[in-house]
Amino acid sequence: LDILRVQEQFSRGPGGMRMHLHYAADLNWRILDDYGSDELKAQYMDKFQDKTIFTCFALTEQSGGTGADIHTTAVKDENGDYILNGEKWLISHTDCCEFAYVIAVTDESKSGDERLSAFFVPVDTPGYEVTPMPHMMGARGAAHTGLKFTDMKLDKKYLLGEEGQGMEIAIHSLSVSRAHIAASNLGMCQRMLEMSLARANDRITFGKPIASRQMIK
């Protein structure tokens, strides 16, 4: 609860502050901790603790996709490694991350969420590209971009969990994030109420602040 109280207070300021805290406090490291192989956790979990790595979470696509309509693919090559192609949209923290959690289709023959798998992708992998998108109102200090994968070869060791577990991993990880979003909304609403009250007291019409008018009350 303490971190949610902090989240609430951070959310009274610029959007970048609340977004970074909300992600860094949990989603940033939890996916690897919960679903990474022993090899990946041994290699990278300490780096989260000393803050030498950060991640982004790449699920959403421009089609509106966060589930069955995801189109980014990860196809196995002859060595069992993966070749990723596709695009993501509305992804935060792409300007400050070393890795991306990417949800992609690994088996087109399956239905629904069983098609999807999750990967821990180093952003310096050839074929990984950050693409621009319009700035989001209300998110000052936080970058949002697209991501594009073009014949991006990824070692099979970067698979998280098992094939077909991608949406389970995404939803499990996002569930804690929702508590942070609720605390953020509370902090933002409190600040907006304060600003509205201040404006109502400062704005004078016909010799009186509008806060004294029956409609405003």
Please identify what each model-predicted range represents.
Residues 72-75:
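A structural signal for short hydrophobic beta-strand segments in well-ordered beta-sheet cores
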Residues 65, 89-94, 139, 176-180:
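Glycine-rich phosphate/pyrophosphate-binding beta-alpha loops
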Residues 6-11, 104-105, 121-126, 150-154:
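Short Ser/Thr-interspersed hydrophobic loop/turn segments at strand-loop and sheet-helix junctions
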Residues 128-217:
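Glycine-rich beta->alpha junctions and the first turn(s) of the following alpha-helix
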Residues 1-42, 46-52, 92-99, 112:
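Internal helix-loop-helix
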